[in-house]
Amino acid sequence: MQMITLAQQAKIASVELAQFENVQKNQALLTIAQQLEQRSAEILAANAKDIEFAKNQGISTAIIDRLLLNESRLQGIANDVRNVAKLADPVGQVIDGGVLNSGLKIERQRVPLGVILTIYEARPNVTIDVASLCLKTGNAVILRGGKETKFTNAVLVEVVQQALETAGLPKLAVQAVTDPDRVLLLELLKLDRYIDMVIPRGGAGLHQFCKENSTIPVIVGGIGVCHMFVEKSADQQKTLELIANAKTQRPSTCNTLETLLVEKAIAVEFLPKLANRMKALGVTLHTDDLQKTEGIEPLDEARMRQEWLSLDLNVVVIDNLTKAVEHIREYGSQHSEAILTSDYQLARQFVAQVDAAAVYINASTRFTDGGEFGLGAEVAVSTQKLHARGPMGLEALTTYKWVCEGDYLVRK
């Protein structure tokens, strides 16, 4: 199928979908969740094919972890869909309004964006997350997964389309591009007549490719060079446990801790404790402030600008909070940054000075997630400032229109 035909079909479906009530959209969502559970064996078998292909291609363990589905992860995806169904539908909400001096009644109402193009790599969960959020908000979506997710996505898209048909919604509101040829992607990125937003989810290369080649607005984000600053007054035992969570809970995610900044005043005391705790967890420290032994490697300045996505952690000793903020400005990706401290005034200073989508005081960066933020599933984590920032839930997939009413009112 030609890409322009695909986009035209999506545009028509988006107009139809926008007219449906919340109850019908929720019925489709609940059917999707049910089918994910009932067809789990089929989905996991398809995923096993993708995993085998990835291993044969020599794809990294971090990417394979993102690609992997198991019973637990699949159940989590189904639960996320049910949670989306429970959320209030933002479409039709009146943001604000009133009656003007002219007598004109005016309201600002939320409406769907229209057609969303999502481009992603080894993340089969994105197929369902994005489809469910777009469905809830009345948007059509074109899904372009990577070649790594070919078999898994084929089954997942089939599940979604069947659920749409069962609920009486337009099947073509969710479509997939299965051919990985980048020429086709380039065609899609030029179809601004039909597609309203592009959301890439993948590495820095994918984001740059979309920014450089798209005539459609692109949401940039998902690159998480996340920092944590251990200020001298922090509770060191609690700090070690928090670092363990932020680094090791799921290292391949974009909200994982990548660089730890330690205030110089406590470095001699704290760093040996850190080294012991991280060694026990299999984490390799990259630092010039500890003697090189097993599990400790020299610091590579270039790697401080990149995600590790693995059990590796940069450790840098910093003079004070001001220097920590300067470091984050230089090396951070405006995703998630944290301070651990007992000094509330310094914490507020950190929040005021750090430019990021999410800033934490005494909490793990792992919370930067649509589900954890109470948004349901997320389509992406935006690190830009327009049109959305941070985890993108339902409201981020809407825009608004001004609805104006008068009694044959004319402007004087």
Swiss-Prot record:
Alphabetized InterPro entries for the sequence: Ald_DH/histidinol_DH (IPR016161), Ald_DH_C (IPR016163), Ald_DH_N (IPR016162), Aldehyde_DH_dom (IPR015590), Glu-5-SA_DH (IPR012134), GPR_dom (IPR000965)
Main location per the UniProt record: cytoplasm
Pathway info: Amino-acid biosynthesis; L-proline biosynthesis; L-glutamate 5-semialdehyde from L-glutamate: step 2/2
An example molecular function term from Gene Ontology annotations: glutamate-5-semialdehyde dehydrogenase activity
Subcellular localization, as worded in the UniProt entry: Cytoplasm
Uppermost EC category: oxidoreductase
Pfam families: Aldedh
Catalytic activity: L-glutamate 5-semialdehyde + phosphate + NADP(+) = L-glutamyl 5-phosphate + NADPH + H(+)
Keyword Cytoplasm: yes
Entry EC no(s): 1.2.1.41
Keyword Amino-acid biosynthesis: yes
GO CC annotation: cytoplasm
GO biological process: L-proline biosynthetic process
Keywords: Amino-acid biosynthesis, Cytoplasm, NADP, Oxidoreductase, Proline biosynthesis
Function field: Catalyzes the NADPH-dependent reduction of L-glutamate 5-phosphate into L-glutamate 5-semialdehyde and phosphate. The product spontaneously undergoes cyclization to form 1-pyrroline-5-carboxylate.
Family listed: Belongs to the gamma-glutamyl phosphate reductase family.
Protein name (database record): Gamma-glutamyl phosphate reductase
Native species: Actinobacillus pleuropneumoniae serotype 3 (strain JL03)
